[in-house]
Amino acid sequence: MPVITLPDGSTRHYEQSLSVLDVALDIHPRLAKSCIAGRFNDQLIDACDLLSVDGKLQIITPSDGEAVEIIRHSCAHLLGHAVKQLWPETKMAIGPVIENGFYYDLDIESPLTQEDLELLEKRMHELAHKNYTVIKKKVSWQKARDTFSKRGESYKIAILDENIDSSDQPNLYFHEEYIDMCRGPHVPNMSFCHYFKLQKTSGAYWRGDSKNKTLQRVYGTAWSDKKQLDAYLNRLEEATKRDHRKIGKTQDLYHFQEEAPGMVFWHENGWIVFRELEILIREKLKEYEYQEVKGPFMMDRVLWEKTGHWENYSENMFTTLSENREYCIKPMNCPGHLEIFKQGLKSYRDLPLRMAEFGSCHRNEPSGALHGLMRVRGFTQDDAHIFCTEKQVRKEVSNCIKMTYDIYQTFGFKKIAVKLSTRPEKRIGSDEIWTQAEEDLASVLKEQGITFELQPGEGAFYGPKIEFTLYDCLDRAWQCGTVQLDFSLPVRLNAFYIDENSERQVPVMIHRAILGSIERFIGILTEEYAGFFPVWLAPVQVMLINITEKQSDYVKKVAKNLQQLGVRAKVDLRNEKIGFKIRQHTLYRIPYILVCGDKEVESNQIAVRTHSGKDLGSFSVNVFADKLLEEISSRCLH
């Protein structure tokens, strides 16, 4: 006789087992109509699942946060339903939910074209608008295997054989004649799956292994209502306009080519942006009293075996042979910094020792995962490592956080999510050390008034960490900064200092990154600003243009004066119409366009326009230069 407790604290007593949907109907018919699933004793379950014991129940409706993930999962099944109707010989692999949508991997005879994708989406809409009931059946492992064997679904059989214990009872979901397998929950009927859009296809290896067959991956998005779907599609359209790969090409920032996949060819304009970021970071390094060092980009495999990287990370490392020795191109800077720390005896008086590097790192990312500047093989880390005593941890972490926020605010990022990851089951170090370390990190965050999300068990085996995630103008999340405590690496590489009692002690090592990868951060900034870099970052800060040839000498003179002041100024003396030149440089997103005609020459002035097309009027060269230099030195965002 289940007693069901509802979110408002009220209880309902029932004489027999009943489904989530039955409870919703008992409360109100309208609630039953909008019931997608249930949360019973903190576990999501299907609307058709029976409740036979006492517990707390929340009816999940489209307005609840959990609903959209259930809808997306069911849309993946809907995609499978439509695929099997259009191309019956297709074998279905996996169809999980991902951020903002879902995908399904298909073993299909011919690659899907854009026309195929449109046809598939149309069929999905036709099926969804039938509002048919989705039937769930919990069956034996053998029954599930027999079902998919009869249908020739070899990938589903592989999942059963390799991932599901033969004593388990898998869930089968019936979409009319189509059958799929899933943990669930799923929608009770297809009336909840009307707001979706198929987006693209790509290749994907079965099980993510390049030795396996390449499948067709179809991506889609799905939402609870039309308003949410339209808003997301509008954000996607805006993201396309802001795509750093497109802007990088139009602004001549960088390029990639087949001979060096995932490695950036920086052009002059892009390298200027890169160097400006380095200058900013170097200023902060000086302010926070760091040493800047430079380690080798390649070291003997023996060292990486000592650190544990070879055992856990070798497949992501590039290697090379020379004189019968195997070398690894470094994927990270930390071992090199430890080796520098070990040179010369260190005393407790030398600590904290803060060591920073713009380290050139390489990681052997899968070619299919490479994506412009956002996912590369060769990148530069604004990496630092702090060696300190346990008593110094709190102060050093506090300074790391302050430095991180200082830099993020320079770029105008206001929404920053912070996560604190604590001890995992498998770890090194005593519980006492972990407790102290976790308390130190949490206390520092609280002292600075920073709200954070606790992630129990998500820390690395060698120490807890703080992660900083930036949200851009399109509300996309970019995980950039980290502050990570490390109890392991100094022990592995025999690093020590002499304490006040003349005894050896192992230092605490703090890994600290703010931008993460400079390449990736430039990609993020390019999209955040849509290529309209603030003046201090802009590759070309000022473009001077003449109206006729008569003003050429004056334009050159003004440009030279600005260049001598450190301004990145260029001239355009082409024999083109003034409107054409203004439009072109506006498209290049140059912050200031200075127009010089006879009037400006006579008055020793310049007519100033912004990259948005706004006419600021005429200024004397000196007044404009003072204003511009103030914008640059203050790193003004506007």
Curated annotation (Swiss-Prot):
Cofactor note: Binds 1 zinc ion per subunit.
Ranges for domain TGS: 1-61
Primary localisation category: cytoplasm
Cofactor: Zn(2+)
Family, similarity comment: Belongs to the class-II aminoacyl-tRNA synthetase family.
Functional note: Catalyzes the attachment of threonine to tRNA(Thr) in a two-step reaction: L-threonine is first activated by ATP to form Thr-AMP and then transferred to the acceptor end of tRNA(Thr). Also edits incorrectly charged L-seryl-tRNA(Thr).
Self-association state and partner proteins as the record states: Homodimer.
Region: Catalytic, residue numbers: 243-534
GO biological process: threonyl-tRNA aminoacylation
Organism: Hamiltonella defensa subsp. Acyrthosiphon pisum (strain 5AT)
Full protein name: Threonine--tRNA ligase
UniProt entry keywords in alphabetical sequence: Aminoacyl-tRNA synthetase, ATP-binding, Cytoplasm, Ligase, Metal-binding, Nucleotide-binding, Protein biosynthesis, RNA-binding, tRNA-binding, Zinc
Binding site for Zn(2+): C334, H385, H511
The keyword RNA-binding appears for this protein: yes
UniProt keyword Transport, yes or no: no
GO cellular component, one term: cytosol
Enzyme Commission (EC) number: 6.1.1.3
PANTHER family: THREONINE--TRNA LIGASE, CHLOROPLASTIC_MITOCHONDRIAL 2, THREONINE-TRNA LIGASE
Compartments where found: Cytoplasm
Molecular function GO terms recorded: ATP binding; metal ion binding; threonine-tRNA ligase activity; tRNA binding
Gene name of the record: thrS
Annotated Pfam families: HGTP_anticodon, TGS, tRNA-synt_2b, tRNA_SAD
Class of this enzyme: ligase
Catalytic reaction annotation: tRNA(Thr) + L-threonine + ATP = L-threonyl-tRNA(Thr) + AMP + diphosphate + H(+)
